[in-house]
Each structure stands twice: as C-alpha cells, then as structure tokens.
C-alpha cells in the first residue's frame, strides 16, 4: 500500500483519486496525529 504525507496527498488529490479508482489499491495518508486511508467508493461499497 502506498503511503503519502498529508501535504503530498493534498497537492495531488485528484490524481490520487483517479489512481485509487483505477487500481483498486488504497493509499495511506499519514498525518502528525493520525493516519487515514483513501479508498475508491466502489471498493468501500463492496466492504
């Protein structure tokens, strides 16, 4: 799973959304206090 900082994710949000939707691979976004996961809506609905 790819991991990016929050700043990197913010700078590339639209590209990351496309990448996640096309590859069906989640992306971890690491922050100072917490981490989050960017996941395609289609994959989220399948959970």
Each predicted region: which residue ranges?
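Structural signal for short hydrophobic segments within the conserved structured cores
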Residues: 2-4
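The conserved cystathionine-beta-synthase
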Residues: 6-22
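Short, charge-rich, low-complexity interaction segments located
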Residues: 26-47
């Amino acid at each position: 799973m790819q991991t990016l900082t929050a700043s990197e994710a913010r700078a590339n949000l639209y590209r990351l959304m496309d990448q996640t939707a096309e590859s069906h691979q989640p992306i971890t976004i690491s922050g100072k206090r917490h981490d989050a996961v960017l996941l395609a809506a289609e994959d989220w609905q399948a959970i």
